[in-house]
Amino acid sequence: QVVAGSTYRDSLVYKYNGAGQVSEEVYYVSIDGSPFADWAKNEFVYSGNGNLTEYKGYFLDVNTMNYVQASHILVEFDNKTNPLILGAEGILLEQINFVSANNVTKATVNDLEDPANNEVATYAYVYNDKSKPATASITFQSIGLPIPVTFHYQ
């Protein structure tokens, strides 16, 4: 990607825990052909049943060469089966709603740099006879209006 006359390339490295879940992703960036260098990272925390319950985002402070936490997302779940469980692939696709075994009911985003960007999303489901979501309503606190979702199964 070219930005302001410079060419940027990026790369991601994934670390896995003993359960085979992605526990960390590290972003590396190369500018104008320079060697790849650390840029940012995310850490993932799971519950005992495999639900992704925490997501911590960090950036690299180039002055100290230490990671500084910038965000913290807490995720809550129901006890019903998630209709699409992608596991690690959900993280690669940045679809954290499809990483876990159960359905997200609430996601609380804490922006540690600017609390004005904090957000809460709540999910309300109507389930079919197989205990999978038939419809959902997602409400973001900042917007206040429910967003309808319909699930289709084959």
Locate predicted features.
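Buried hydrophobic residues that stabilize the cores of well-folded domains
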Residues: Q1-Q154
